[in-house]
Amino acid sequence: MGRIRSRVGGTRNLIFIGALLVLMLVLLLDIYVEDKIFEPLGYFYLFFAILVVFYGVYPLYVNRRLTKYYWDRTKRHWLSVFGLIFIIFLIVVALIGPFLTQDPTEVNFLRKNLPPVSFSTQQSVYDLEAEKFVTRDTPGVWQHPLGTDDKGRDMLAMLVSGARVSLQVGLLATLIAIIIGTVVGVLSAYLGGWADNVLMRFTDIMMTFPFFLLLVFIIFIFGPSLAFIILAIGLTGWTGTARLVRSEALSLRTREFIMASKSLGASDARIIFRHLIPNVLSSIIVIATLSIPGIILAEAALSFIGLGDPTVTSWGVVLNAGQRSLDTAWWVAVEPGIVLFLTVLAFNFLGDGIRDAFDPRSQL
């Protein structure tokens, strides 16, 4: 059985490396073509998707008995099931939605401030025959089912574009923060001594800075690029993960299987990657799931106050535009607010369900 698992794991690693090579080849080709296949952040998004498929979904498929056990515990919380369904729907929309909707940056002042379908609003329009502005009842149209903003941009297209931006920021920044926090926490617990003191004191110093104000300061200095926003959030949001992983790893460091591995001559790297990290993985998954909504909110808040990337259409940008016209076009602010609220709620529900599923002490 051990040989079979080792062989399956080796095959998975080879296929994963092959997929990364194909992705790198497409990236190199994309540099020299005029019509880009993906935007730069799209490649990071694809890398994350490949990583999740090979090291998240595939292990669940192989170990079906354990997967069924965790799924049975998770699905007892109907709110966590709702969160999972909504997140899957959001991911599908973010992936294929931009190919089915209009250009979110296309401006058409002839169709500005159109309400959603089934709603109507009073608008002042210019009558060419009377040669003056008149007030007319303007209904919603199916060409723009969720309405348009004050520049005539399609709200559905902007919400879909915002979903992609929010998921890119949430997933990639969380990945960066989780990797840094896991490395710091595991090394601090395993090495102990002066290394533990240095790493934890540095973590304490990072935690003393207000997270959002630190983000505002960094982005104000270096500029509001979306890639830099992701990097800034990831580099400043790892402290909670580090402390949690350290506490879990400290309880494992003196366990019998760790001591047995040391006595058999296993290297420190092997002990860390084969024993420590796999045994704290459940806690890492929980904190990652619960960190994503906070990161999505942070990006939306940065965009709302004007520190987001002006070249992308995010929910925070749409909210900023909508709050200036609440009296005439309420849907411009309400729709992205509802989607943002549901997204944050879904990730929190899913995180709570996963936490209860992984916790053997929970009463279900």
Locations of regions flagged by a protein language model:
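Gly/Trp-centered helix-boundary motif
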Residues: 1-178, 182, 322-346, 354-364
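Alpha-helical transmembrane segments of integral membrane proteins
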Residues: 151-364
